[in-house]
Amino acid sequence: IVVDALHFHRSRVKLEELESLPKEWFRFMHLCYAFQEIPTDLDVLVHDGREERLYPGEGAIDLKGILSKLPENIVRGIEIPHSVRTAEIGFEAHARRALEYAKKYLE
């Protein structure tokens, strides 16, 4: 199972629900952040997921809580598409910044 932080948050899944499943089922985690408020408009949901994910620490998702319920050796991938930021600073700078934020948040 892949756990995507954005979809986990939007689905209102509880951390306790992760504990009810065998840890060996989990292989991969998508790290990102999102606003606390969950949009009700489908177009906004799609836009935010594809073009406006936030760096770790900028939003409301409990990444540390989610990770605490998953295997320690789970593969973690940073999935933070953000069209405005990439237009402003470029893809490489955005990727580097995403990695910096993730490292700082997870320390």
Identify the residue ranges that each predicted region occupies.
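Histidine-acidic metal/acid-base catalytic patches
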Residues: 2-3, 8-107
